Amino acid sequence: MNFRRRFIQLPLAAAVLTLGAASAWAQGVTLLNVSYDPTRELYVEFNQAFAKHWKAQTGQDLTIKQSHGGSGKQARSIIDGLEADVATLALAGDTDALHTNGGWIPKDWQKRLPHNSAPYTSTIVLVVRQGNPKGIKDWDDLVRPGISVITPNPKTSGGARWNYLAAWEFAKRKYGGDAKAKDFVTRLYANVPVLDTGARGSSVTFAQRNQGDVFISWENEAYLLEKEFGSKVDVVYPSLSILAEPAVTVVDKNVDKKGTRAVAEAYLKYLYTEEGQDIVGRHFYRPAISEKAKAKYAKQFPALQLFTIDAAFGGWEKAAKDHFADHASFDQIYIKK
């Protein structure tokens, strides 16, 4: 009798669970993408495209929320409890921090997706006032007396770290050795009147507040500025710059807690599709995977001599220790205004 009662109850319980699951599925799912400053416009369009794709594939409604700021600050926010499903930060070093500070992701996170989990690349360029009145052509023009340089704080901004290292390597190659490079960036940052926390803040400082003669910028941000303020700014490509490789990952602890792993993984994989790569190119990032997208957008990216973080600085772990840790080179050269 007890057996029969339990036997009857089990299907009822299963039915309740099934209805509950169906109800939850019908209510949809929400993802949070925690990213760095200049990806706002990219992910607005990409999120719309992926949500449409996900609905067509699964029938489930998807809401994607975005959080943007300096890459280092964004990484710290995740470590401190911001429940990101995916992190699309400015550099692998910031993403590595999610492993070393709390095990939010596995150590080998970069091996989970093609191209070291970097579906797009970028570089660092110079944005000047229209007509280039100060005659800025290369990195060494930024250390001239009287030149005002806008760049964010490498303590909080991933883009600022790319900026700093690009200038350092230029000087190291041109003038010979790290000592000369350190002197060069010391003089460069003496020309920086203010350090914003992120790249978009520096963009606003330069373009809207009209501070500075030159803005050291992500390539995509430079073209967005040119698109919005075309009559006010010009883009200058230096003789040498760095290959910036923003990387992406699911935040394992959060997706497993929230039950969003499947959709989060599909979201990142969609960046590698033809549609994803085309959206990347439309927003002035360099497609890393699709040959079709590379060819389509090749003309908007002038030829440029690029070096990698691994070849020049031994990777992000070493670069962070040598240049951006407490009391490392940036702390030594920067004098607060």
What are the functions of these language-model segments?
Residues 34-36, 128-130, 148-174, 188-192, ...:
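Short beta-strand->loop
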Residues 47-56, 79-83, 92, 99-103, ...:
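Sec-exported extracytoplasmic/periplasmic mature domains
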Residues 255-337:
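Extracellular/periplasmic juxtamembrane helices and adjacent flexible linkers that interface
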Residues 131-137, 156, 169-177, 254-262:
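Short helix-loop capping/hinge motifs at secondary-structure junctions, enriched
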Residues 38-42, 46, 74, 90-94, ...:
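Stable alpha-helical elements in mature extracytoplasmic
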Residues 27-156, 335:
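N-terminal segment of the mature folded domain
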